[in-house]
Amino acid sequence: MAFTGKYEIESEKNYDEFMKRLALPSDAIDKARNLKIISEVKQDGQNFTWSQQYPGGHSITNTFTIGKECDIETIGGKKFKATVQMEGGKVVVNSPNYHHTAEIVDGKLVEVSTVGGVTYERVSKKLA
């Protein structure tokens, strides 16, 4: 299923524990809790531009092609190289320290990230 669209966070699971695992400061974790982050995805075949826009103007954008190595930036600001794959309709990022999947389920963007044995799930509703 095509990923293109603009999505707003609707629900999160295990936010605090995951953000602590990323070694984010407690004040940043508290400040970001319940923010309405907008994810904008542009898909052109195997090419993706995946942006997250935070209130206050901060954003992160990752551009990648399925099957090719790229640089990925996490919500914690860390950067690493990974080869993004498409597996069963899911976008999959796998590295030694980070695992992330994203898929469209009932029109919603469902993302699951795991770091150091801690899993975080975010569900976003489609805006456009």
Curated annotation (Swiss-Prot):
Coiled coil: none annotated. Keywords: Acetylation, Cytoplasm, Lipid transport, Lipid-binding, Membrane, Transport. It is a peripheral membrane protein. Its main location: cytoplasm. The modification N-acetylalanine is found at residue 2. It comes from the Eukaryota. GO terms for molecular function: fatty acid binding. InterPro entries: Calycin, Fatty_acid-bd, ILBP. GO terms for cellular component: cytosol; membrane; nucleus. Pfam families: Lipocalin_7. The keyword Transcription regulation does not apply. GO terms for biological process: fatty acid transport. It is found in: Cytoplasm; Membrane. Found exclusively in the ileum and to a lesser extent in distal jejunum. Forms a beta-barrel structure that accommodates the hydrophobic ligand in its interior. Can bind at least two ligands per molecule, however, the stoichiometry is debated. Belongs to the calycin superfamily. Fatty-acid binding protein (FABP) family. Binds to bile acids and is involved in enterohepatic bile acid metabolism. Required for efficient apical to basolateral transport of conjugated bile acids in ileal enterocytes. Stimulates gastric acid and pepsinogen secretion. This is Gastrotropin. It comes from Sus scrofa (Pig). The lineage of its organism: Eukaryota, Metazoa, Chordata, Craniata, Vertebrata. The gene is FABP6.
